[in-house]
């Protein structure tokens, strides 16, 4: 997916430590964005090295966002299967 967006809010870098399957300590880096395309507002997340190298973007300009939408299924506390759409940013210029 590719969209022209305006950044409403850029959240700070979040680093979450975890242990890999082989026992190696790792860090998962992510940065969230609240974006609008002029009609809709949506939350998108940048992860990994892209999030680490992410500068502070000018919120007054239009930016070109490339990303993907993934659907995650989960079961709530009542046993109902629910779905959540997640937007991941692969490139933001």
Which residues does each PLM region occupy?
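Single-stranded nucleic acid-binding surfaces, predominantly the OB-fold ssDNA-binding core
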Residues: 1-93
């Amino acid at each position: 997916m590719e969209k022209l967006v305006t950044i409403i809010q850029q959240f700070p870098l979040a680093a979450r430590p975890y242990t890999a399957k082989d026992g190696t300590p790792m860090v998962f880096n992510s940065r969230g964005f609240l974006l609008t395309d002029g009609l809709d507002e949506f939350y998108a997340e940048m992860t990994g090295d892209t999030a680490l190298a992410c500068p502070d973007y000018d919120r007054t300009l239009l930016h070109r966002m490339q990303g993907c939408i993934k659907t995650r299924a989960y079961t709530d506390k009542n046993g109902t299967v629910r779905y959540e759409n997640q937007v991941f940013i692969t490139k933001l210029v």
